[in-house]
Amino acid sequence: MEKTIEDPPTSAVLLDHCHFSQVIFNSVEKFYIPGGDVTCRYTFTQNFIPRQKDWIGIFRVGWKTVREYYTFMWVTLPIDLNNKSAKQQEVQFKAYYLPKDDEYYQFCYVDQDGVVRGASIPFQFRPENEEDILVVTTQGEVEEIEQHNKELCKENQELKDSCVSLQKQNSDMQAELQKKQEELETLQSINKKLELKVKEQKDYWETEQLEHLKKENGHLFLSLTEQRKDQKKLEQTVEEMKQNETTAMKKQQELMDENFDLSRRLSEKKMIYNALQREKERLEGENDLLKRENSRLLSYMGLDFNSLPYQVPTSDEGGAGQNPGLVYGNPYSGIQESSSPSQLSIKKCPICKADDICDHTLEQQQMQALCLNCPICDKIFPATEKQIFEDHVFCHSL
């Protein structure tokens, strides 16, 4: 029999409460050679009855409870306990499960209640040596063996007396058992009658309960059909809501994209507007400077600004003739209209008598007015490259 994974039944029974003499171990060696299987032989006493969960364990000498076993094997139950050969039993421990040290161990027979019923003499697991082969027995050892033999004989007599007492107890228990069996048979007969009555009552109850369950099942089936219809309608409604939600999300995303694009374009327009506003303010400042310089020169020459034929029209008079696509009007319209040679009046300087003072001043004003300066990097563009100037300003906003 191989060792099983199932743990044997144990208990916390102490040594004083065990009956070591009910199972006797035979042919136990003083030591066993490691690496080999060990056969354990034992004999049941006359009044001992083995049970299915009895087991034999190998314990280290000095153990206190049966839970301290090193390994164990289940006991094989004999077929006929009355047969003499059935009293002689043996189990074989495989070498793999045996201890590997040289401590002292012993076999112990433990019943299914966790009570020790027999124990062997101590033995070791170690190789054979010359001291074990040559045995010298002294007179003292012989006397000790004889004394031990006498003690065993005395214990044997006590066991016989105990056996007689146990046999008497067994007879009494057999009579009691017979009485209990008769009572058990009576109770079993009553129990069968009750079981039959219960079965009849149960069949009647089950039939009635089955009819009730059938009716209830019909009602539940109708209710389930209606619920499935409602569920189908709800699923259709949910699907429509999902489609509407998807459409709304797409529309929202389109609006967000459009809003983002408009925001970006607005930001670009704002930057262009700010740049043109700064350019307008700069041109207005330059225009004011040029007007003051022109007035100063005209007063220096003894002329009146209002009497000049190339006066720059005011915003009220020239607004209608300007390009409607320009935000601030064309700042060069007055200069272009007054740049005709026929309208220019050449004056001589009253001090140095120079006759090119107006042409020289007018040329400087025309050069300054015909240039476009970037309000961000101050780069200068000719007035003819207005589209390039606007693209350049727009690039600063990217």
From Swiss-Prot:
In-chain residues carrying the UniProt-annotated modification Phosphoserine: 397
Coiled-coil residues: 137-301
Membrane topology, as annotated: Peripheral membrane protein
GO cellular component terms, semicolon-separated: autophagosome; autophagosome membrane; cytoplasmic vesicle; cytoskeleton; perinuclear region of cytoplasm; PML body
CLIR (motif): residue ranges: 133-136
Region (Disordered): 314-341
Binding site residues for Zn(2+): 374, 377, 392, 396
Subcellular location: Cytoplasm, Perinuclear region; Cytoplasm, Cytoskeleton; Cytoplasmic vesicle, Autophagosome membrane
Alphabetized UniProt keyword annotations: Autophagy, Coiled coil, Cytoplasm, Cytoplasmic vesicle, Cytoskeleton, Membrane, Metal-binding, Phosphoprotein, Zinc, Zinc-finger
Interaction with LGALS8: annotated span: 323-333
Short motif LIR-like, span: 203-206
Molecular function in Gene Ontology: zinc ion binding
Region (Interaction with MYO6): 347-398
Gene Ontology biological-process entries: positive regulation of autophagosome maturation; xenophagy
Disulfide bonds: none
Stored Pfam families: SKICH
UBZ1-type zinc-finger residues: 371-396
InterPro entries: CALCOCO1/2_Zn_UBZ1, SKICH, UBA_autophagy_assoc_protein
Function: Xenophagy-specific receptor required for autophagy-mediated intracellular bacteria degradation. Acts as an effector protein of galectin-sensed membrane damage that restricts the proliferation of infecting pathogens upon entry into the cytosol by targeting LGALS8-associated bacteria for autophagy. Initially orchestrates bacteria targeting to autophagosomes and subsequently ensures pathogen degradation by regulating pathogen-containing autophagosome maturation.
Domain notes: The MYO6-binding domain is required for autophagy-mediated degradation of infecting bacteria such as Salmonella typhimurium, but not for bacteria targeting to autophagosomes.
PANTHER family the UniProt entry points to: CALCIUM-BINDING AND COILED-COIL DOMAIN-CONTAINING PROTEIN 2, SKICH DOMAIN-CONTAINING PROTEIN
Subunit structure: Dimer. Part of a complex consisting of CALCOCO2, TAX1BP1 and MYO6. Interacts with MYO6. Interacts with GEMIN4. Interacts with ATG8 family members MAP1LC3A, MAP1LC3B, GABARAP, GABARAPL1 and GABARAPL2. Interacts with ATG8 family member MAP1LC3C. Interacts with LGALS8. Interacts with TOM1; the interaction is indirect and is mediated by MYO6, which acts as a bridge between TOM1 and CALCOCO2. Interacts with AZI2.
Protein family according to the UniProt entry: Belongs to the CALCOCO family.
Protein name (record): Calcium-binding and coiled-coil domain-containing protein 2
Organism the protein comes from: Macaca fascicularis (Crab-eating macaque)
